[in-house]
Each structure stands twice: as C-alpha cells, then as structure tokens.
Amino acid sequence: MRQLKREVKIGNVTIGGKNPIAVQTMLNVPVEDIEGNVAQAKRCEAAGCQILRVTCPSPADAKCIEAVKNAVNIPIVADIHFDYKAALACADVGVDKIRINPGNIGDDDRVKAVVDACQQKNIPIRIGVNGGSLEKHILAKYGAPTPEAMVESALYHVRLLEKFDFNNIVISIKNSNVPRMMEAYRQLSAVTDYPLHVGVTEAGTYQMGLLKSGMGIGGMLLEGIGDTIRVSLAAEPEKEVEAGYNILRAVGFPVAGPEVITCPTCGRTQYPCTQIANEVEKRLQGCKKSIKVAVMGCVVNGPGEAREADIGIAGGKGEAVLFIHGKPVKKLTGDNILDQFMDEIYKL
C-alpha cells in the first residue's frame, strides 16, 4: 500500500498524493557549455524524463538554467550548494524547483531570502540530505551517517524552512549503502508527510549502479515509499531515465511502452533467442503501446513461462511457435522469423 504524502506541484508535474511516480535525471554537461546542456536536456525529454535537474554553482550560471528551461517542456530543478545568491538568481529566471540544504547556505537571513523568493513564485524546495555530507554536529553525535543521523539532518533542515512558514517541501535522504538508505527512508516516511524523492547516491559504475538502484529504489517502492525517483548512474542521463522506468515496471507500476521478457536460454535452445529478444527491444524503442512481449528459448516451457505476455514466440530449429496470451496461434518458419514476429506485434 502506497504511503500517501502531501502534493507538491513542480512546474507542470505534481508529485505526492496518488499522482504517478515521476522519473528524474540530472544533466552532466559542464554548466559553462550552455549549448551542450540544452542538447542533452532535449535528449532527456525525448527519453521520457519528467523532472530535470541542472547544477547552478554561481548566480551567473542561472543563464544555463534559463536556457534549458526555455528549450524543454518539463520542470527544471536548480541544484544549489553554498551560494544562496545562485538560488535567488534561479528563482528570478523561473526555475520550477530548487534543491538545497538550508544549513549550508549561511545564516538565517540568507535562508529567509531564499524562502521569500520561492514563496513569491510558488517554487518548492527539495531538502537533499546525503550521507557523505552530514552536518558536523550530527556526525559527532552518531559517529557515522547512520539512518538516524540522516533523518535528524533532514528534519533539522525542514525546521529551518518551517521557521519561516515555508512548507512547499520535498525531501531526499540518500546514501550509497543500500540497507542504510532504505532504513533511513523508512524512518523518515514514518514521521513526515512531505513527498519523498528516492534514490541511491554514488551507486558506483553503470552495472553496479543499476543493481543498487534496483534494490534500493525498487525496495522502497514495494514498501509504498517514494513519490519521485532518480537512478544515479555513471552514464548518460538518458540511461538513468530508462533505468527509472524499468524499475517502476519491474515493481508493478503502470508504465507506457512495451516490456520485453526472455528466458536465459539453455542447451535446448535451437535458435538465436537472445539476439532476437535484443532486436525486438531495439525495434520497439519509442513505442508507447503498453504490451508485454516474450521471446522464449524453446517450446517446452516457453508458452507456460510467458502466459501473461500479450504476444510471444517459443523457438525451435528453423521455426518458432507464435502465441498470444499464452495460447499457440501458428508457426513462424524460414529465415525471417524476427520480421514475421514484428509484423504480428504491430498488429496488436
């Protein structure tokens, strides 16, 4: 059962409540390269990104935020550290959300300046707690970035904003240790109704990042925790978007587009099952039809293992049985089984 949080509107996307889980990513082009950021932002939008974060180290870099904002039709989040004037500059150019830790931008007057700017334009603030950068007094208390330490840090920042009657807040509480990250989110979700941005930070190289994010983000979603997600990978941000949707699909959330399933193959396999599955997935990129497609290695277990698929094939030597909703329909034969199969998919 999903844990329902208060709704927060980020540009044209609303998270929290019963709204769909929003998939985010972050640009990784140097902020000085405005053309490169704009081009990458357009690719992310085409990949299905719903909320896009861009770093803004200084007030002058708000021009990159503005350029990206004008180039795409998805909400833009400014990632701010230390320089509160950068947050003010981003508010001036119409950013849709600001990610900040109020405790690292200076005294109360600076926090209030950011809060006032955001309140005037209805810009939400994400408090982004990271296990690698907790406040010294909290680390001294707990000795390590424990779940309790991260939750205390998050609530400390929340109170800084609430002190100025600001509650248009999203919270994230990330760690590179998956069990620690999951326990932190559990504890935080139990004590706040602000929507939660879920992710595993510093997840590692691409493959390990996929595994850790799948376990951490997917695990939280299965427990009903999370309103928006970002899969952090050492890869192009478009890959993060793809991974985010795959995690949502894997844990049972409705996601537009096809899902291709295939068996791992074994000694019974007599046709290029894996190659065909990969090619089917490639050809279906960009398809918005929500169908499950199965490419199975043999007729022994294939139809039964994929009975929940909308359409599939189970191959043999020089042929494949086409089945729809688990029931055999006809045989595909010859050298162009893949093309025949694709024709049948497009008929659905």
Predicted regions and their residues:
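Hydrophobic or amphipathic alpha-helical targeting/insertion segments
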Residues: 85-126
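Catalytic alpha/beta core domains of metabolic enzymes, predominantly
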Residues: 130-133, 138-285
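Active-site mouth loops of central-metabolism enzymes
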Residues: 18-36, 55-57, 74-82, 138-151, ...
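N-terminal amphipathic alpha-helix/helix-capping segment at the start of soluble metabolic enzymes
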Residues: 1-26, 119, 282
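Glycine-enriched alpha-helix->loop->beta-strand junction motifs that scaffold or abut catalytic
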Residues: 71-74, 92-98, 119-122, 189-195, ...
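Hydrophobic faces of well-ordered beta-strands that scaffold small-molecule active sites
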Residues: 21-27, 52-54, 76-80, 98-100, ...
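Glycine-rich, proline-tolerant flexible connector loops at the mouths of alpha/beta enzymes
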Residues: 34, 45-69, 99-107, 169-178
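Alpha-helix-loop-beta-strand connector modules within alpha/beta enzyme cores
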Residues: 59-80, 113-125, 185-196, 280-282
